[in-house]
Amino acid sequence: MDELTSLESWIGPLLQRLEPAGRARLARRIAQDLQRAQSERIGQQRAPDGSQYARRKNQKRQKGGRIRRRKMFARLRQSKHLKARGNASEASVFFIRRAAAIARVHQEGLVDQVRRGGPRVRYERRELLGFADGDKQRVIDTLLNHLSGL
């Protein structure tokens, strides 16, 4: 979070010069760029620090079905579940409804039921949303593009 506070202290005075509608427009654009980057990173199965996600656990009876061979979180990264919002005071990227509950279990490595009435399992920690190395530069580039377009 130290990177975010340094970014905020640098950008804050520039944003104060904008009208609230202009800040909201900029925040929406930043949130959309971050949403796109988060979705791509989830598709690559990488955490914000660049490490690979922990693999799925092997089942006791190995089944060679399609689900086991596909990437994890394929539907979570869709814009239907991964939303971006921005207003005059903030830009945010988040999961909604049931997707938020699933993402939280994986993000924090919690215990959850595999299916209703099924066994409870501790999931490996897989950081889905986070501030990656390139995200700070992405925010700065979006800000500079917005300010140069005024």
Spans of features found by a protein language model:
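Short, Lys/Arg-rich flexible segments
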Residues: 1-150
